[in-house]
Structures are given as structure tokens and as C-alpha cells.
Amino acid sequence: MVEKRDVEREDKFNLTVDVLMLAGTLLLQSGSEIYRVEDTMIRIAHSQGIMDCNALAMPVAIFFSIENTNISRMKRITHSNYNIEKVCDVNQVSRELVSGDITLEEAFEKLAQLKKKKAPYTNKQLTLAAT
């Protein structure tokens, strides 16, 4: 029989993975360095007591797994651009979560809002600026 404590633990693990995967996705889509994506994901996991974990980021995908559990995720990155403002915003949310200033739920909500945030420049503006 599965104990309530085990279910709560797995729910927390899943929420943590949701948060760090969203953070990693936003960072990678916004042009962040690969090492920063992996480091952010690991720091978020460690802040929630998940020490035995693996994060792997590539330009086209991110992977995360927790040792000795059946929890693992993969996210394919289909488009990206350079949005340093969004990278800074995601890093700020990560810092607030790791320092304990916000909860997992608050971090997820902030990241979800950042995901909806429009790029500061349109493709047309970028093209005109480059010429």
C-alpha cells in the first residue's frame, strides 16, 4: 500500500521537476548558455532536497531525471531566439526560489507568466536593426 507521505513526496518531486524544466526551457529558448541551463536546473533541484539528480541540456532538448525514482523528463526545444531580459528574469526567479523567498508554486506561476511574455522586438524590427 502506498503511504500518503510517499504520494506527497512524489507530488513535490513532480512539481519541482515541472518548475526546473520550465526554467530550463525558457533559458534555452532565450539563448542562455548550456552550462547555465544545467546549473539552474540542478540548483533548483538541490534547493528542494533532490540531491541525486541529472540534468543534460543540448541546443535542441533538455533532460532531467531523479536517481532511484521513476521520475524523468525530456523537452524538445523547437524554436529559440535571443532574449537576455527573459534570461535575467528566469535567473531572478531561480535565485528567489533557491534562497527560500518564494515557494515552488509561486516560482511556477512566475515562470508561466514569463513564458507568456512577448519578445521586446518583432522579427521585422530585428531585421531592420541588422541592416
Regions found by a protein language model. Name each.
Residues 103-111:
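Non-transmembrane, extramembrane segments of multi-pass ion/lipid transporters
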Residues 1-102:
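Soluble N-terminal domains of membrane-associated systems
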Residues 119-131:
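Core alpha-helical transmembrane segments of integral membrane proteins
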Residues 110-118:
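Cytosolic juxtamembrane amphipathic/interface segments immediately preceding
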